[in-house]
Amino acid sequence: MKYLIAGTGGVGGSIAGFLSLAGKDVTCIARGAHLQSIQTNGLKLKSDLKGEHTLRIPATTAEEFNGKADVIFVCVKGYSVDSIVELIKRAAHKDTVVIPILNVYGTGPRIQKLVPEVTVLDGCIYIVGFVSGTGEITQMGKIFRLVYGSHHGTVVKPGLLEAIQQDLQEAGIKVDLSPDINRDTFIKWSFISAMAVTGAYYDVPMGEVQKPGKIRDTFIGLSTESAALGKKLGVDFPEDPVSYNLKVIDKLDPESTASMQKDLARGHDSEIQGLLFDMIAAAEEQGIDIPTYRMVAEKFKESNH
């Protein structure tokens, strides 16, 4: 199967690198100096799971790609989704599936509306991956888990989801085929929102969230509020969402930070709209009280407007 990775950052670059190491047919979409470096020197992967490798992976801009792909992983940031619509339309054939791997809830249905003729699934990822240099991706720690599935009513070619799962597992990625992807993407959104917002509010790595005290209490407050929103939206949590979020945060490398935090620190575009302000808007719409979210939002109102 042919894989196309739209967005070769920490997430997309890690997926591409692992697939390439397993001999799968993968092409990367990137831009700027990062793309030039991948084209000239190969993609450098520094991975706690796989070691260090330089991989010759075909790479191009979205505009220049003119092939077809069986599976398109969308790994751009939430604010860049519109930029890859034309790419999806060109690269898809009748059985192609698009798997968005974004931190922002509701991405699958949002892309599906933009490309109604293509089969769009939904997905999320648990990984610490980031661009550590031009043309270089670092994957930290032991967690690399990909969750994907189709929304109710989406028709997928029989056996395709399982075939993708097998390829990813052969590449060394832990994969869950989700029977309820709406639930699983909400759970991921709730976690990454609490993680990124806490980290950015206090400007600390995750080790500080792992210790008892005010910072951890803020993370718990945010998790409690998003859990209340999830319950109101009919999300069927398999376990207590707050203890789940704490379990995940406590497994992270103490040095790790969320990509939103890194972007804010550098003055780059960030996912603060999707991870903070969209959460607040959704909660207000549902009449959920969110004092912790409102408190942290005060700090970021200026940066967003």
Name what the model sees in each region.
Residues E52-E136:
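Rossmann-like NAD(P)(H) cofactor-binding subdomain of soluble oxidoreductases
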Residues G67, N103-D184, K188:
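Rossmann-fold dinucleotide-binding core
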Residues M1-G51:
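NAD(P)+-binding Rossmann beta1-loop-alpha1 motif at the extreme N-terminus of oxidoreductases
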Residues G159, A163-K174, I215-P238:
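Flavin-binding catalytic cores
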Residues N182-Q210, K214-A227, D253:
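Active-site-proximal catalytic alpha-helix in oxidoreductases
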Residues I220-H305:
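NAD(P)-dependent Rossmann-like dehydrogenase/reductase catalytic/cofactor-binding core
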